[in-house]
Amino acid sequence: MAQLYFYYSAMNAGKSTALLQSSYNYQERGMRTVVYTAEIDDRFGAGKVSSRIGLSSPAKLFNQNTSLFEEIRAESVRQTIHCVLVDESQFLTRQQVYQLSEVVDKLDIPVLCYGLRTDFRGELFVGSQYLLAWSDKLVELKTICFCGRKASMVLRLDQDGRPYNEGEQVVIGGNERYVSVCRKHYKDALEEGSLTAIQERHRHI
């Protein structure tokens, strides 16, 4: 019986790598997968899921107007789909998460979603909120803070490398703009207005 999975984490935990590995595992057994990623995230080029270790795969794009259930149903009529995988799933709308649950419940196709749990303010993305609420299986992918603790928060840095927690929720960027840290160092960095100073002190402990 198909299920809806949500693999969530902070940044740089290997979400895209895990997605690509899962897709490959299906394909290796002669099964067909359909991969989606957010149109808004074009850091590695549009229509592609790429990992930091160099793996990549073509992907269909979704935006807030994409009817995922209708697209996937039409595609499955043309050729059997054995699994749907969605990268950057934090950018899904509430309705799109519901549509993916319909893919599972009505089409009996497993759906694996990969995304961030919270934004740079420590607040849930809409897509993540409903995936956490409606998924059959929740899996946390772990990464670590510079101190060695589990990194569960994401700091946004300005052009001078200073952390801040105001502004638009979505600003696309990679390591130069976002850093995954533990909750303690997330709060410390915002209070001090500097992540670098905290990292330097930690090195000398």
Curated annotation (Swiss-Prot):
The gene is tdk. ATP binds at residues 9-16, 87-90. Keywords: ATP-binding, Cytoplasm, DNA synthesis, Kinase, Metal-binding, Nucleotide-binding, Transferase, Zinc. GO terms for molecular function: ATP binding; thymidine kinase activity; zinc ion binding. Zn(2+) binds at residues 145, 147, 182, 185. Its EC number is 2.7.1.21. It comes from Salmonella choleraesuis (strain SC-B67). Coiled coil: none annotated. It catalyses: thymidine + ATP = dTMP + ADP + H(+). PANTHER family: THYMIDINE KINASE, THYMIDINE KINASE, CYTOSOLIC. The active site is at 88 (proton acceptor). This is Thymidine kinase. Belongs to the thymidine kinase family. One of its GO terms (biological process) is DNA biosynthetic process. Homotetramer. It comes from the Bacteria.
